[in-house]
């Protein structure tokens, strides 16, 4: 399943090159505040487009992950100690970028007793205090399925809860070695049961079958997920899983139509789509987030 990267990418996978004043400003902001972004660490193909729009997805809890998923470019190993000043710097960066919608994610920190939940909560509250009109979307690890740690994060009241199942049930083990399909569905269902809008996503092109994709989407709907992202898997290095096939834009459009037909409220589906791609647009129709942007407040969850 591992191979070199000689296969030629199709034309529809050409991403925008980094450029412009906004791109430079975001890069300086990230560097000056000693922040990490999943855009850089995960080699996101949309970094040029998003940074040129003045947006970035901040990654907390360092940039070294305790897990070694076979699809992910983020560095793995022994993480550094927690940075107690990180929540305040993240909040200030959100203010500087004047974001109406921010996305925060993290590496997985399985060595921490609470999986980093306390830092997650502190970051959400710092952003809220500094930026009361900003919608906060969190993209978290599975917290080892510990719902008390997940509740620590949810008690800080993010506006959208995101956790990706990444692939279909059959391919979980080769793709996400230390995670499980059922555990991911459990954390999504728990967040949804507390009233949070929930979101998840899959990569296509890893060898999944059509019936497996439709089953995974139905499982997400059964777990209460309302926002969906579907994108093409891209092999980050020769040491990672090889691409099984290039999924066409037309097929992504078909999956979007199917997902909408089974009840997803918003679907972002395309070759270059990633979890936080156009996240502000994904949340635009969600009542609570819309009220927040218009100067109101979200109901307690």
Identify the residue ranges that each predicted region occupies.
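A secondary-structure boundary/capping signal
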Residues: 40, 60-61, 105, 139, ...
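Core AdoMet radical
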Residues: 73-89, 96-189, 199, 203, ...
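Generic alpha-helix structural propensity
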Residues: 21, 25, 39, 60, ...
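Nucleotide phosphate-binding site architecture
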Residues: 45, 66, 169
């Amino acid at each position: 399943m591992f191979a070199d990267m000689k296969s030629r990418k199709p034309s529809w996978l050409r991403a925008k090159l980094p450029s412009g004043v906004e791109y430079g400003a975001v890069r300086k902001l990230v560097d000056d505040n000693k922040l990490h972004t999943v855009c850089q660490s995960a080699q996101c193909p949309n970094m040029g487009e998003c940074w040129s729009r003045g947006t970035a997805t901040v990654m907390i809890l360092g940039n070294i992950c305790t897990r070694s998923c076979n699809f992910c470019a983020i560095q793995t190993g022994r993480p550094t100690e927690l940075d107690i000043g990180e929540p305040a710097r993240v909040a200030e960066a959100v203010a500087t970028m004047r974001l109406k919608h921010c996305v925060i994610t993290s590496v997985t920190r399985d060595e921490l007793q609470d999986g980093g939940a306390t830092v997650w909560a502190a970051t959400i509250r710092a952003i809220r205090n500094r930026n009361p009109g900003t919608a906060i979307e969190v993209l978290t690890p599975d917290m080892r399925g510990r719902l008390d740690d997940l509740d620590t994060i949810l008690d800080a009241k993010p506006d959208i809860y995101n956790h990706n199942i990444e692939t279909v049930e059959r391919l979980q083990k080769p793709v996400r070695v230390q995670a499980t399909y059922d555990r991911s569905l459990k954390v999504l269902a728990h967040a949804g049961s507390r009233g949070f809008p929930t979101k998840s996503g899959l990569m296509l092109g890893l060898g999944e079958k059509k019936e497996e994709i439709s089953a995974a989407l139905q499982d997400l709907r059964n777990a209460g997920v309302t926002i969906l992202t579907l994108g093409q898997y891209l092999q980050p290095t020769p040491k990672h899983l090889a691409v099984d096939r290039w999924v066409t834009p037309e097929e992504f459009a078909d999956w979007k139509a199917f997902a909408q037909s089974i009840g997803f409220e918003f679907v972002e589906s395309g070759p270059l789509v990633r979890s936080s791609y156009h996240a502000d647009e994904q949340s635009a129709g969600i009542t609570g987030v819309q009220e927040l942007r218009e100067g109101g407040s979200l109901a307690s969850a």
